[in-house]
């Protein structure tokens, strides 16, 4: 959990440490920074599609592996060269990495999919296929997506595309029996 991470970071991190949290929690960096002021703690998010195939075996059914990270608005840009180096190192390993000036937009864009699909999937006890077709499941999903989109606009975030349409396109590419990690946990 996030709370369990704080004592560890307080013990090992210094002013020369760069932390890039990639949890599915919006604003993780700011939360950690309040308890751990010494290191530079960015915000980040990750897109990866993986699943447990068998005990000890994790597979990627589709090659989705993207990482976004960056400074929050108003955050001092300490260790910027190191953050750029992390981006380059990740790219050299084949990861689609982005050190961005718009991390809040990127993180909220991701959150606009994972949170609504997880919550609606649990609430309705449905898998991905139910959200692909017009009906109650898709309507609930899109309502939740648009709530997050509205929140983003209120925060001053301008999205490049309609998040509802974007997230329906994501669903099109998934198997009908797909579930989120929230549902599997």
Mark where each language-model region is.
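Rossmann-like NAD(P)-binding element
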Residues: 1-15, 19
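Rossmann-fold dinucleotide-binding core
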Residues: 23-110, 116
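Short, conserved clusters of charged catalytic residues that mark active-site
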Residues: 4, 27, 181
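Helix-loop-beta segment of a Rossmann-like dinucleotide-binding subdomain
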Residues: 10-13, 58-72, 122-132, 178-184
């Amino acid at each position: 959990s996030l709370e369990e991470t704080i004592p560890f970071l307080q013990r090992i991190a210094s002013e020369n440490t760069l932390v890039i949290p990639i949890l599915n929690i919006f604003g993780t960096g700011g939360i950690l920074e309040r308890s751990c002021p010494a290191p530079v703690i960015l915000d980040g998010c990750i897109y990866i599609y993986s699943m447990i195939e068998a005990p000890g075996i994790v597979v990627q059914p589709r090659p989705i592996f993207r990482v976004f990270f960056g400074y929050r608005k108003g955050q001092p840009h300490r260790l910027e060269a190191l953050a750029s180096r992390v981006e380059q190192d990740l790219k050299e390993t084949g990861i689609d990495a982005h050190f961005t000036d718009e991390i809040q937009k990127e993180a909220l864009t991701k959150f606009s999919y994972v949170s609504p699909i997880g919550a609606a999937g649990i609430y309705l006890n449905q898998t991905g296929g139910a959200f692909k077709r017009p009906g109650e499941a898709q309507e609930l999903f899109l309502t939740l997506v648009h709530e997050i989109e509205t929140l983003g606009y209120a925060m001053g975030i301008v999205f490049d595309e309609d998040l509802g349409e974007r997230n329906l396109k994501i669903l099109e590419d998934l198997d009908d029996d797909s579930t989120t990690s929230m549902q599997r946990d």
